[in-house]
Amino acid sequence: MSRKYFGTDGVRGKVGTFPITPDFAMKLGWAAGTVLASTGTKEVLIGKDTRISGYMLESAMEAGFSAAGVNVALIGPMPTPAVAYLASTFRADAGVVISASHNPFYDNGIKFFSNTGTKLNDAQELEIEALLEQALEHNALQCVASEKLGKVRRIDDAAGRYIEFCKGTFPNHLSLAGLKIVVDSAHGAAYHIAPNVYRELGAEVISINDKPNGVNINDHCGATHLDSLQSAVMIHEADLGIALDGDADRVMFVDHNGHVVDGDEILFILAQAAYQKGEMQGGVVGTLMSNLGLELALKQMGIPFLRAKVGDRYVVEQLKETGWQLGGEGSGHILSLQHASTGDGIVASLQVLKAILESGKRLAELKAGMTKLPQVLINVRLTSGSADSILSKDSVKQAVITAEEVLGNQGRVLLRKSGTEPLIRVMVESTDISLTQQQAEYIAQAVKVA
């Protein structure tokens, strides 16, 4: 059975448009609270990013949980991985994040974490959706008796606790003293956290894009827009730059030359560091979108590599199935399960900084052992029709077959629908950049006219 509202990363959409409305959020809170209460849940932790709509959705979720008899603890603007961590340490039974991650301010979303800091499984989400569907259909929800209504409290020291957690993942014998780091917080949830983590570990920090106003989150900044970070690194002659997205669950780097270091290269750096120290546990899990260059570089070290479906939840599932520790996506979702239960941009960045200090090499040198194959990604926005119906059309299938024949064994083609937006992503990868671009545009055109 497929999920109707939960995409690859919870529920997400444009604010004020179903399902991101206060009415839906309240009913979702009630449905989730009812399901969680049936397993003994007494309290849920709610965090959010810096979008102006977060206040509205937070209040609606509060009401829904209270109606289901579940207490709520509010921690304010906080990175997604912080909610996962704090839900466990505060002994809450679940965590809720109100965020649309790297999307613009006019989008928002809602996702859940279990009390172990992992995302809810598909079965739990389906159970929540079934109750939610009833509430939406009948435009009503069943409130518990007055004496059993949930209470709400606010936690004031959550940021400090999470800062200490992040610092605790960095070895005590190492210091960032002598490093000049530019930090781009994307005007997002880590604006009051990330710069302090690096400063308290000894670095000289230049903090940019750290003044959220409710509407500037991810606005030409952060992990998805690296131009301002690249400029700042060069202007300040910094050793490197670190960019987080709006909810700080992904990270990207810029080296001292102003060159981008993406998630695939971060995975290579971390795997290489572990391999050289004899600490590599198993292999690495990437996704269908991971660059072939990563797989080839790991193969040279004898490190196994598996591809999961796109989405960090599926990377986590694959890691748990294999018992491996390291995985992630090119977009900067990095999973290091010995340190955190979910993708954590700050924690991942500290592991890269650890590799830099222990190797005595600069970031540009560490990534040099991996050669990325030219990869072209074209996002085709859908104006009509569903992604599934378009992907099933013969004309699109034939375009893919033709492109694969042209590329031969020197490349690969991947078409997939976005789990969060009305998009079909066309990815082509090969050793020849001009051929890669040509075939990607050919397939994208076939998708557009399908």
From Swiss-Prot:
One of its GO terms (cellular component) is cytosol. InterPro entries: A-D-PHexomutase_a/b/a-I, A-D-PHexomutase_a/b/a-I/II/III, A-D-PHexomutase_a/b/a-II, A-D-PHexomutase_a/b/a-III, A-D-PHexomutase_C, A-D-PHexomutase_C_sf, A-D-PHexomutase_CS, Alpha-D-phosphohexomutase_SF. The active site is at 101 (phosphoserine intermediate). Its EC number is 5.4.2.10. The modification Phosphoserine is found at residue 101. It holds the Pfam family PGM_PMM_II. Binds 1 Mg(2+) ion per subunit. It catalyses: alpha-D-glucosamine 1-phosphate = D-glucosamine 6-phosphate. Activated by phosphorylation. Mg(2+) binds at residues 101, 245, 247, 249. Keywords: Isomerase, Magnesium, Metal-binding, Phosphoprotein. HAMAP family: GlmM_B (MF_01554_B). Catalyzes the conversion of glucosamine-6-phosphate to glucosamine-1-phosphate. PANTHER family: PHOSPHOGLUCOMUTASE (ALPHA-D-GLUCOSE-1,6-BISPHOSPHATE-DEPENDENT) (PTHR42946:SF1), PHOSPHOHEXOSE MUTASE (PTHR42946). Belongs to the phosphohexose mutase family. This is Phosphoglucosamine mutase 2. It comes from Shewanella sp. (strain MR-7). The lineage of its organism: Bacteria, Pseudomonadati, Pseudomonadota, Gammaproteobacteria, Alteromonadales. The gene is glmM2.
